[in-house]
């Protein structure tokens, strides 16, 4: 599923249509979401890094919404949308804006594509401040736990 979507975002040739009808359905729903929301992809697999916190990640895609505002998105092939995904997107936004303070990210979007049922679920994450705070708390906790030896 992700390889078809990534090819679409990158503008590279889309692989032959998948034989599996579930995957076909998921890809079609993604393409419909893109068209219905007038999405313009501007980057995929964007590497992001925070010098301040020594963390890095790869954002699945950046896009322009119908208002021309820059948004970031992440594709998930899970059974649901979980709170940890919110922190991940907030982390990406935090790192992007640390790298380029002038870059404004309007929305953070999770696109969940079901592996088993061709379901497409799209969730915009509106509470950046709380999720960024939680992400930074996780970084602090990770750094505290790092030197603790296993018993």
State the predicted function of each range.
Residues 1-56:
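Metal-dependent nuclease catalytic cores that hydrolyze phosphodiester bonds in DNA/RNA
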Residues 46-151:
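Nucleic-acid nuclease catalytic cores
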């Amino acid at each position: 599923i992700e390889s078809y979507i990534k090819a679409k975002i990158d503008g590279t040739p889309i692989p032959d249509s998948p034989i599996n009808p579930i995957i076909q359905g998921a890809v079609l729903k993604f393409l419909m979401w893109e068209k219905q929301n007038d999405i313009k992809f501007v980057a995929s697999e964007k590497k992001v890094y925070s010098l301040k916190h020594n963390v890095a990640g790869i954002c699945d895609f950046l896009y322009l919404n119908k208002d021309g505002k820059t948004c970031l998105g992440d594709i998930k092939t899970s059974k649901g949308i979980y709170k940890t995904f919110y922190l991940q997107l907030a982390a990406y936004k935090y790192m992007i804006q640390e790298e380029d303070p002038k870059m404004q990210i309007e929305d953070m979007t999770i696109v969940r594509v079901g592996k088993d049922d061709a379901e497409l679920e799209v969730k915009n994450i509106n509470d950046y401040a709380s999720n960024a705070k939680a992400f930074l708390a996780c970084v602090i906790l990770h750094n505290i736990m790092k030197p603790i030896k296993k018993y």
